[in-house]
Amino acid sequence: MARCSVLYFILLSALINKGQACFCDHYPWTQWTSCSKTCNSGTQSRHRQIVVDKYYQENFCEQICSKQETRECNWQRCPINCLLGDFGPWSDCDPCVEKQSKVRSVLRPSQFGGQPCTEPLVAFQPCIPSKLCKIEEADCKNKFRCDSGRCIARKLECNGENDCGDNSDERDCGRTKAVCTRKYDPIPSVQLMGSGFHFLAGEPRGEVLDNSFTGGICKTVKSSRTSNPYRVPANLENVGFEVQTAEDDLKTDFYKDLTSLGHNENQQGSFSSQGGSSFSVPIFYSSKRSENINHNSAFKQAIQASHKKDSSFIRIHKVMKVLNFTTKAKDLHLSDIFLKALNHLPLEYNSALYSRIFDDFGTHYFTSGSLGGVYDLLYQFSSEELKNSGLTEEEAKHCVRIETKKRVLFAKKTKVEHRCTTNKLSEKHEGSFIEGAEKSISLIRGGRSEYAAALAWEKGSSGLEEKTFSEWLESVKENPAVIDFELAPIVDLVRNIPCAVTKRNNLRKAFQEYAAKFDPCQCAPCPNNGRPTLSGTECLCVCQSGTYGENCERRSPDYKSNAVDGHWGCWSSWSTCDATYKRSRTRECNNPAPQRGGKHCEGEKRQEEDCTFSIMENNGQPCINDDEEMKEIDLPEIEADSGCPQPIPPENGFIRNEKKLYSVGEDVEILCLTGFETVGYQYFRCLPDGTWRQGDVECQRTECIKPVVQEVLTITPFQRLYRIGESIELTCPKGFVVAGPSRYTCQGNSWTPPISNSLTCEKDTLIKLKGHCQPGQKQSGSECICMYPEEDCSHYSEDLCVFDTDSNDYFTSPACKFLAEKCLNNQQLHFLHIGSCQDGRQLEWGLERARFSSNSTKKESCGYDTCYDWEKCSASTSKCVCLLPPQCFKGGNQLYCVKMGSSTSEKTLNICEVGAIRCANRKMEILHPGKCLA
């Protein structure tokens, strides 16, 4: 039949070649049907309006013309609208700020063109407090107190300089003594060095350091551009002026897509210790180290440009420095506005009020850096045109660099190489490689805005004037930006203010919650392995190379991959503080999970940190100052004429009626923490000589703490504490097995056997080998054959206690090896129990049962075991369960004469009844096989 079909099509082809071919457009198409979906890729079809006429039949139209066509439509993703939760209740009225707040969260960011959220997330209102404010004024001791509450050195009074910031140190001065012999100007733009920096948004924020404060020291620095020195502020360790304009420091970088440009795993260290989140922000490199830019502007613009077509990017950048600076490591002078904001923070933790610090002043401050400017452009090229140009990535970078030196820097002796003007891309644009770009995104920083704007490249523009770059460079000296900087957390600045320790702890807690709002774990997965990034309350998709479209849903012809890389879901809430003073949180690689060979998520699944819990009544946050950050037991001991100081409780114990001094004859009671119990006499008595009469007492653990295991493992039963003797079972997802023991028992104060932290799941190769075969067998084609212990049992399998009737000995064997040897007709091996062999009743009965089994007429396979006449196989547990004697069959050939308990009378029982009685551990003596003679 197939041969006839081939001959038919050969004949048809010959006829068509002679001119007898159907002109299919003679039969028009219908209109396309409406799309089957409004979004998320639907289909639509159309049909050819066929009329079976003479022309149709004579010209083979039936065989030549397609009758139906289908095409994809509405391939854009369905929009996801931003969704806000309801406001929670009003917080308690804070007595220090006389405000209360209520907050709501973003339940779902907008994505794929959905409606954004524009309503506020926090609401405040004034209130009348019912409690007193516990914040006390800072103790200035021997320093001068400003009207603002700030403490400054006494030597700064009446020196003619506004050191307090409110001029209160210069009030009522009879005579002033100047610090410097003449007046010096401040360093230009010195206030920029004291700005806060929002690491998560990549932009400077409000002033946190007062760099107008000189600290009563006349330290100056001189610039080569001016004859007059500048006054150095007290917050700066050193300052050095320089101007760098070398032509050879013009650098270029090539990016196949924006994922590598906006994501750098190695650049998250500045805040990873505060939350360990997986998110990152767009990072751009300068000459010294990586820096962030505002991902709500330039990076967002780059993402939107990449959606138009499959794109590659070439970035060219040059750093010009005016000066370098280093901030002092300690004793920094805060700005008045930042100090006022810190002083107005409540003592009780309030997420909304504490988070405003990061909104207003950023998350970090500059510890070192440079002032200057950065010439920085990101050129977008069509990936297809770059590929067709015939240039390599390195050659394309070189052409952009050479052309920039000639057209922007107007560098003399710059020779444009032949390959940069004669490739297929440059030839379309009169020899210009840069003109072949789709557009450019300006990342220029520093200098006057009109000069910076003039440096930006636009497609089809006539080019720059020769003075444009030099004018911008000159303006950088007067209008610099902070570049090439190092950062430290802004929380470190919260010192020497009232309740500094309490407020630092609250700010650290607020930062964890605040940083989570920037985590793209809240976004839905992007098509074609795109990487989601969160911009405010909107999720954007950063496309992989070879993909494009508003949400990366379109593919270039050569993009064939179907792999889906895994991305982290959001962190769970922190667990409660357990008896080991630890708490933990977890996350899953399921947004999405890796599929079809995609990469697994990088980073940790579980985080653990120290924590504390109180056994006393919670009376609110205490006001702890920097000089009070010590425990009560560190305070000086109270001297008294009589009585006893507080005794030392045993480890994991505490004193019920705790105080510093006890009267003679007074008793104290020792209690133990949860999970421990007192062993011994738990009362101490104060003696007249100031010592304690006490017996031996200790706190012994009565429970085991839930073990820490890999997230892929499931603990059953799942609870925080387990009593002595309780067991847990570790299981894995379907298709995987525990790579070690799966059952553990709480014994004493630890788990037996010990649970390894590295214990995880592995692919269940035994199931794959086994196929549809019985235990101990493997699939070989369509047949089942016995496994070979040496070849097929190299992986982990649980331990079994096994009895060998040949050697009359028992030993521990891996389950796989035991089943394989049983399959190979090794009948002398008998299963005793799961787990390693241990002396006891279970082992005694197992040995007796194995010896007695040779006389059984029934041998039913059941899991690892074989059930005999006195047993049945449990379908739910795959274990042999002993029958009760009345459940045994009557009669039979296997009979025994026995004597029960202390009775002297003899009785004839069959093998089932004898086995059932011995299994129940009842006393019985077997006199001889066969019926009793009497």
Swiss-Prot record:
- What are the glycosylated positions? W29, W32, T38, W90, N324, T392, W568, W571, W574, N855
GO annotation terms (biological process): complement activation, classical pathway; innate immune response; killing of cells of another organism
Sorted keywords for this record are:
Calcium, Complement pathway, Cytolysis, Disulfide bond, EGF-like domain, Glycoprotein, Immunity, Innate immunity, Membrane, Membrane attack complex, Metal-binding, Repeat, Secreted, Signal, Sushi, Target cell membrane, Target membrane, Transmembrane, Transmembrane beta strand
Q: How does it sit in the membrane?
A: Multi-pass membrane protein
**What stretches pass through the bilayer?**
278-290, 402-415
Q: Which InterPro entries match?
A: C6_KAZAL, C8A_B_C6_EGF-like, FacI_MAC, Kazal_dom, LDL_receptor-like_sf, LDLR_class-A_CS, LDrepeatLR_classA_rpt, MAC_perforin
Q: Region (CCP 2) spans which residues?
A: 689-765
Could you confirm whether the keyword Membrane appears in this record?
A: yes
Record-annotated disulphide pairs: C22-C61, C24-C65, C35-C73, C39-C78, C82-C117, C93-C127, C96-C133, C140-C151, C146-C164, C158-C173, C180-C218, C399-C420, C499-C623, C521-C570, C523-C539, C526-C541, C543-C552, C577-C611, C589-C601, C644-C686, C672-C699, C704-C746, C732-C761, C773-C823, C784-C801, C786-C837, C793-C816, C862-C873, C867-C919, C880-C897, C882-C932, C888-C912
Q: Where is the MACPF domain?
A: 176-522
Keyword Disulfide bond (UniProt):
yes
Segments carrying the region annotation (Factor I module (FIM) 2) are 858-934
Recount the PTM note: All cysteine residues are assumed to be cross-linked to one another. Individual modules containing an even number of conserved cysteine residues are supposed to have disulfide linkages only within the same module.
The record's Gene Ontology cellular component field reads: extracellular region; membrane attack complex
The primary site where this protein sits is secreted
Highest rank taxon of the organism: Eukaryota
- Biological function: Component of the membrane attack complex (MAC), a multiprotein complex activated by the complement cascade, which inserts into a target cell membrane and forms a pore, leading to target cell membrane rupture and cell lysis. The MAC is initiated by proteolytic cleavage of C5 into complement C5b in response to the classical, alternative, lectin and GZMK complement pathways. The complement pathways consist in a cascade of proteins that leads to phagocytosis and breakdown of pathogens and signaling that strengthens the adaptive immune system.
Please describe the quaternary structure of this protein: Component of the membrane attack complex (MAC), composed of complement C5b, C6, C7, C8A, C8B, C8G and multiple copies of the pore-forming subunit C9.
Q: What is the protein name stated in its UniProt record? A: Complement component C6
Organism expressing this protein natively: Pongo pygmaeus (Bornean orangutan)
What are the leading ranks of the lineage? Eukaryota, Metazoa, Chordata, Craniata, Vertebrata
